[in-house]
Amino acid sequence: MVAAPDRLITLAVVTGAHGITGEVRLKPFTEDAAQFKAYGIFSANGTPLTLKKLRPDPKGWVARFSEITDRNQAEALRGTALTVPRKALPDLPADEYYYIDLIGLPCVDPSGQSIGVSVAVENYGAGDILEIEKADEKRFMVPIAQAVDVHDDHLVIAADFIE
């Protein structure tokens, strides 16, 4: 699978300040805190933030960044996405992929006929869902596990799920 190495991947969003010393609450989009810590430096709207400390919290994680030293600075980050370039993510085995790599791939039916482009991956609790936009800009969703066959440069969608 060919991935855009400079594409920014959001790993967490700052949800607010925690305390008065500049710590922030994070809503993580990864389950692995150790892997999150390993990135070390994140981009926040183009500004680098260096992770000093990370700990679990009932509402997600609490983080301290070297550049943020008081509550006002922490509050100013509310809603900010913490990103890393796609190339910073670890390589995966040949039969695995990151969902971000699926976005933008052309989607075809089993005969190879174009049906649209993948535009999003969602999870509403029952499994991962791929959203596809047709040429007429109408969108439909298919369950990834049952309906999508992933190839390096396109996705094959099972006929039963095509609208």
Curated annotation (Swiss-Prot):
It is found in: Cytoplasm. The keyword Glycosyltransferase does not apply. This is Ribosome maturation factor RimM. One of its GO terms (biological process) is ribosomal small subunit biogenesis. The keyword Chaperone applies. Belongs to the RimM family. GO terms for cellular component: cytoplasm; ribosome. The PRC barrel domain binds ribosomal protein uS19. GO terms for molecular function: ribosome binding. It comes from the Bacteria. Binds ribosomal protein uS19. Keywords: Chaperone, Cytoplasm, Ribosome biogenesis, rRNA processing. An accessory protein needed during the final step in the assembly of 30S ribosomal subunit, possibly for assembly of the head region. Essential for efficient processing of 16S rRNA. May be needed both before and after RbfA during the maturation of 16S rRNA. It has affinity for free ribosomal 30S subunits but not for 70S ribosomes. Residues 94-162 form the PRC barrel domain.
